[in-house]
């Protein structure tokens, strides 16, 4: 029976070097292969021209190079670009380039589907099929960086893990991808320009805090009232607000990095004064700021955007309590590329 070939990009530099020495070949050959894979983006062994034919054949015998491909590209009227990314096993994920006058932000996915069940999110309606590998996350960033330079004449400035999936339910691969993105051997991007958004997996927040991460953390909160949050995000019954707060305090103690709370305000759900007061009280307990996010419809009439006066009431209360707040206007709504809309609908 033929032995299955391993994806070579799952190997570290040290593992590549050891592969060559185990075949009585110089270790530096591993460095050459590593450069082809990560600096030059090679998708086949044939093009690794500084390796002999016999060395390339050796690699072919033992490994494959799995890579992503853009299956479909859609451009929004506002310039946003949504990619349907085909993985090596046929699954699809979506990633988005969000341009502004001064920034180019990549919104990347971490899972095929999602592990969680947030009622307001289109991705949650998809069954989680598997986690993305580090190279599949990294490749999304590389692809979007190319698009930013092609269409907007500038490299990526920011990365947000706010696409399909819960990053902390795939945290090892997410962290490995970030290591590669920030490494001089990868894209060399500052970790301070990377934000990982989570629905609040408290145990993993604590575990990651121990590793002295340099990226920013955002929490999909939506309500600081337990009953309301559980109704919106049923899985949060396992991660109550008091436990989440303690985990976030631990994060701040370890990193000294403020948390961003993400809050979508819906009509009749979390637009009352009690909701505002609860959020203000919660934010006061840990260094934080708030992003108020416009709701993007997903074809489910149980949710509707709150009235402007409700958003204004939130903004005023937060500012009055010296809590930084930004109202985020969604981009790419016309191509289902906005926050909460990624669901492989058009493929």
What are these regions (language model features)?
Residues 1-92, 99, 249-258, 265-347:
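Auxiliary Fe-S-binding modules of radical SAM enzymes
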Residues 145-321:
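Conserved AdoMet/S-adenosylmethionine-binding subsite of the radical SAM
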Residues 13, 115, 201-203, 226, ...:
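Alpha-helix N-cap/helix-start and coil->helix boundary motif
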Residues 76, 109-110, 197, 220:
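Short linear Ser/Thr-Pro motifs
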Residues 99-142:
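Canonical Radical SAM [4Fe-4S] cluster-binding loop centered on the CxxxCxxC motif
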Residues 81, 93, 104-108, 116, ...:
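Generic beta-strand structural signal
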Residues 97-98, 173:
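Residue-level structural signal for beta-strand termini and adjacent loop
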